[in-house]
Amino acid sequence: MYSMMMETDLHSPGVQPPSNTGQTGGGGGNKANQDRVKRPMNAFMVWSRGQRRKMAQENPKMHNSEISKRLGAEWKVMSEAEKRPFIDEAKRLRALHMKEHPDYKYRPRRKTKTLLKKDKYSLAGGLLHAAGGGHMGVGLSPGGGGGGTGGVVVQRLESPGSGASAGGYAHMNGWANGAYPGSVAAAAAAAMMQEAQLAYSQQQQQHPGSGGHHPHHHPHHPHHHPHHHPHHNPTPHPPPPPPQPMHRYDMSALQYSPLPGAQTYMTASPSGYGALGYSSSQQQHQGSPSSAAVAAAAAAAAAAAASSGALGALGSLVKSEPSVSPPVSGGGPHNRPPCPGDLREMISMYLPSGGEAGDPAAAAAAAAAAAAAATSRLHSLPQHYQGAGTGVTGTVPLTHI
């Protein structure tokens, strides 16, 4: 025990000069390092200073952390009598420190805290959040994973009625909320195409209005009269409804074949799909009493959608699609599944229901004439209609080809 006391007594004079020199250097400099005045050593530091040097010499390969562990364990087992001289030395160093630095105040060193990473929301969530501010979220069809071009076709709104532009798109929400969960990666690719696509379609649907699309309807109007008027003369011609029904069949085509190639069908010229809607609404009003309920439902849907803007009609018409689509799948002797780009076939699919009720022979003749006209017109269809038609073959087989 005396040997340890002698060692500490020998080392204790050496403890003071480093602390004094460091303190005087810090006090005389009056520089930035004056803020870093070291704290006075406590009893353990006074004792462990000499012991650390001795243990490092005995075990040169031992790490400093291991030395600290052993010194701490050894200090704990020491008695009060053994610690007394080191405690006294620490008191003397503290008094000296207070004398040299009367205004010293311990300021703990600020530890650089690692910044917590912000939660990265997915792009879909970001798009849905943006939809709350009046922007549009993007929902992709099952075939939309191949690229961004296919995803833009079935754009939808997640939060209807929010923001300035959300009022026009509010009714599109009923089309693909739970049916088509889009992948986030493809949604990111589709977000770039979204703005230009939306601007073009909105401009085509709002600015031309009812007057802009009807000039495209009339060139097809004479073609329907030879096929329909001989069989459906008792039903009068009501005025064509507002331009909302023109999107009935492009949305139904998307519903049955949501493929990337259908984007060109969605964004085709107004003469392409404008005539489809007019012919479909016209044939419904010209139909026999069996299709009168369908026409009434379509008219009610169009009237309900008229108050929500030009684009608001898309969702409401899609919601009424189940009442229109059953004749498509109904297999009769004269029924043929429609090609989305063929005007004649969409007309002829309503002919058998009206013709068989009145004159079956006349209905068969009209269906044959419509089939001949359809096959002759298939070769002159635009490329995007053919692409959409080939996509439909997976669900509705084309028997006339």
From Swiss-Prot:
Residues 37-105 bind DNA. The keyword Thylakoid does not apply. CDD domains: HMG-box_SoxB (cd01388). Keywords: Activator, Developmental protein, DNA-binding, Nucleus, Transcription, Transcription regulation. A motif (9aaTAD) lies at residues 345-353. The keyword Transcription regulation applies. Residues 1-38, 197-249, 320-343 are annotated as: Disordered. This is Transcription factor Sox-1.
